[in-house]
């Protein structure tokens, strides 16, 4: 019973967080030597750092054609937009769904659908609030193009935010990905944009809470109309 209760709160940690937690822990020990109340503040910050870099197991739906959320967070934008030029996907607008991640969300990023990475392009930029529309164009970003089995393409863009200063991408051109497979993360608050293939409607609405690798964002085979309005 106790083990089950602990497993509810204690999740695996992404390896990217190991050095940060170690630094926080060492600083905490020093703070205890200086003044005990400061040490307890350090304990709280160390626990928060561990929590930020958590990497929980996700149960990804297996039905063919489903596109899942690449990130935990809230849907902040749904609009037509041209995918990043550096991906070479052409000038035609695609439906863009943006998922904003706060500093309290899990920041491990997952592939929205299975396919082969055909392009990876990093572009330096500003660090505006990631919830702003212009963050897609102005902020530091890392863009991926994924070719699906039927030849269509989808784009996924990692966007740095107001606090984030480090985008981690663990795939390169030619890497095969499974739906829900981990491909990177962004530290300390950020955003993920997904560009859907032509004719594919998002099955989410503004303000909807998303779980990476689990929440269905769209369905390549569904005739269902696009949802309107916002989450209530």
Swiss-Prot record:
Cofactor: pyruvate
Keywords: Cell membrane, Decarboxylase, Lipid biosynthesis, Lipid metabolism, Lyase, Membrane, Phospholipid biosynthesis, Phospholipid metabolism, Pyruvate, Zymogen
EC class (word): lyase
An example Gene Ontology biological process: phosphatidylethanolamine biosynthetic process
Swiss-Prot/TrEMBL catalytic activity: a 1,2-diacyl-sn-glycero-3-phospho-L-serine + H(+) = a 1,2-diacyl-sn-glycero-3-phosphoethanolamine + CO2
Pyruvic acid (Ser), modified sites: 190
Processing and modification events after translation: Is synthesized initially as an inactive proenzyme. Formation of the active enzyme involves a self-maturation process in which the active site pyruvoyl group is generated from an internal serine residue via an autocatalytic post-translational modification. Two non-identical subunits are generated from the proenzyme in this reaction, and the pyruvate is formed at the N-terminus of the alpha chain, which is derived from the carboxyl end of the proenzyme.
Membrane topology, as annotated: Peripheral membrane protein
Subcellular location per the Swiss-Prot or TrEMBL entry: Cell membrane
MF (Gene Ontology): phosphatidylserine decarboxylase activity
Pathway membership, UniProt: Phospholipid metabolism; phosphatidylethanolamine biosynthesis; phosphatidylethanolamine from CDP-diacylglycerol: step 2/2
Record site feature (Cleavage (non-hydrolytic)), residues: 189-190
InterPro entries membership: PS_Dcarbxylase, PSD-A
Record Pfam families: PS_Dcarbxylase
GO CC annotations on file: plasma membrane
EC number: 4.1.1.65
Cofactor note: Binds 1 pyruvoyl group covalently per subunit.
Active site feature: 190 (schiff-base intermediate with substrate)
PANTHER family: ARCHAETIDYLSERINE DECARBOXYLASE PROENZYME-RELATED (PTHR35809:SF1)
Assembly mode: Heterodimer of a large membrane-associated beta subunit and a small pyruvoyl-containing alpha subunit.
Function as written in the Swiss-Prot or TrEMBL entry: Catalyzes the formation of phosphatidylethanolamine (PtdEtn) from phosphatidylserine (PtdSer).
Family label: Belongs to the phosphatidylserine decarboxylase family. PSD-A subfamily.
Record's protein name: Phosphatidylserine decarboxylase proenzyme
Organism: Cereibacter sphaeroides (strain KD131 / KCTC 12085) (Rhodobacter sphaeroides)
Gene: psd
């Amino acid at each position: 019973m106790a083990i089950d209760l602990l497993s509810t709160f204690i999740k695996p940690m992404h390896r990217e967080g190991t050095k940060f937690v170690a630094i926080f822990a060492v600083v905490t020990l020093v703070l205890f030597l200086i003044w005990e109340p400061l040490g307890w503040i350090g304990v709280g910050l160390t626990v928060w750092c561990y929590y930020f870099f958590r990497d929980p197991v996700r149960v990804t739906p297996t039905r063919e054609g489903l596109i899942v959320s690449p990130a935990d967070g809230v849907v902040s934008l749904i609009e037509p937009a041209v995918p990043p030029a550096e991906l070479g996907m052409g000038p035609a607008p695609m439906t863009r769904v943006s998922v904003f991640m706060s500093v309290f969300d899990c920041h491990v990023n997952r592939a929205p659908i299975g396919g082969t990475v055909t392009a990876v392009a990093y572009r330096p930029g500003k660090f505006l609030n990631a919830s702003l529309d212009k963050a897609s164009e102005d902020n530091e970003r890392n863009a991926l193009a994924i070719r699906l089995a039927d030849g269509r393409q989808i784009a996924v863009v990692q966007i740095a935010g107001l606090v984030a200063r480090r985008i981690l991408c663990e795939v390169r051109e030619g890497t095969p990905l499974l739906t829900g497979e981990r491909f990177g993360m962004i530290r300390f608050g950020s955003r993920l944009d997904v560009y859907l293939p032509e004719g594919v409607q998002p099955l989410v609405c503004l303000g909807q809470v998303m779980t990476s690798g689990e929440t269905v964002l769209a369905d390549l085979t569904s005739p269902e109309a696009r949802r309107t309005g916002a989450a209530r």
